Amino acid sequence: AVNTAMQAIDKIRDSSTSHERCSIIEVMGRNAGYIALWCGIASGAEDILIPERFDGNRPKLENELIESILEKKALGKKHHLIINAEGVGHSYGMAKRIEQATGVETRASILGHMQRGGNPTAKDRVYASTMGAMAVDLLCQGKTNRVVGYKNGQFIDFDIEEALAMKKTIPAYQYDVAKTLAL
């Protein structure tokens, strides 16, 4: 999903740059902001909006974005890229408010299910083959209710109930890196 989204983001960014616009690109991520975070870092987005960092206060968020755009505009920045996870949402409303408040032409693009398409990377294919083989091996050993995954450089298996209870959090350092790269 990230690679497919990046293809679209690169094209939108080119247009945003040449027309001196602000672009809000909404990517998948209803409950988790990993796709938005990775796309934001990879694209050098000025702002990345993820559910894990959104407190539900939309006016406050929009004011922060407006301030960010105006600050960067004062420094000579001619375009602005915002990657927005769908869990934060309201991209069209944000675009309208930003344009009204800053005078910067602002467009929202929602990538939606397009991100689910595309060819898997070589890494995706190797991981899928390895995990599939491991799952078959586990079944041949009489082990059921197992989940196969990849962690710390190794393919592993664990109980399905344990897997369902796991919570994956956004690394604070990675989010901070994204903010630093956007300067």
What are these regions (language model features)?
Residues 97, 114-129, 136-140:
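Catalytic, metal-anchored helix/loop core of enzyme active sites in primary metabolism
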Residues 9-13, 136-143:
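Short, hydrophobic alpha-helical segments
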Residues 107-109:
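Generic long, charged, amphipathic alpha-helical segments
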Residues 1-105:
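Accessory alpha-helical/coil subdomains and C-terminal extensions
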Residues 93-96, 120-126, 158-166:
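Short glycine/threonine-rich loop-to-helix capping motif typified by GTGT followed
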Residues 2, 62, 128-136:
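Short, amphipathic alpha-helical "lid/cap" segments that border enzyme active or binding sites
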Residues 146-183:
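Phosphate-binding loop/pocket of nucleotide- and phosphate-handling active sites
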